[in-house]
Amino acid sequence: MHAVLLDFNGTMFFDTRFHMEAWSEIYHELHPEDPNPLDPKLICGPCNESIIQNMAPWLNADERKQCSERKEELYRRMCRRNPDSLHLVAGAEKLMQGLHERGIPFILASASIKANVDFYFDSFPIGKWLKKEDVVYDDGTYADKGEMHLEAARRLNVPFSECMVIEDSVAAITLAKRNGAGQIVAIGEKADGSDLIQLGAA
């Protein structure tokens, strides 16, 4: 592989529970009549715009944006309330240093919004290896994570077919495979990743 495209949430930083708690609060504000817990499959992978459209199709564009910003504020607050969990996954720094030493270009392609990217650069030592301005994030111009992968490869000037994609969600891995990623590596918080392997991840 000639380049590596790194996801962040759920791969470099195990934060699924914080996202889940924040989305759950948003969901039950929008659906106070529903006592059931939020299905994790509804929020893992798609960008905020898609999640909110599915969750509350009656909201207009401005309301969806406000909803997205509120969800991320809740998420960051939950992260700060749990400082013991606010660290990179074991091996993440070693991976980035190893890629740097070998001259293999790598980049973050995250479904996070800009405010979260700023939060990550403030909270983790990733600035040692990555430039914030190079990060591909959810700025509202990408239809899905697959488009983010392709943009990340373009920024590195490497064909997507020669890129390794490191992801944790079924949706993102499915898109990476469909778009012809050279290699897909699945990393996740759960020990059993058989569902991701079946999709073509290593």
Please tell me what each predicted stretch does.
Residues H2-A90, R102:
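N-terminal helical cap/lid subdomain that shapes the substrate entry/recognition surface
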Residues T11, F18, K114-A115, A171, ...:
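Conserved Rossmann-like nucleotide-cofactor binding loop
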Residues D39-C44, E69, K128-A143:
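A short, structured active-site edge motif that brings together acidic residues
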Residues A143-V170:
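Conserved Lys-Pro-Asp/Glu-containing loop-to-beta segment of HAD-superfamily phosphomonoesterases
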Residues M164-A202:
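Acidic, Mg2+-coordinating phosphoryl-transfer loop and its flanking beta/alpha structural elements
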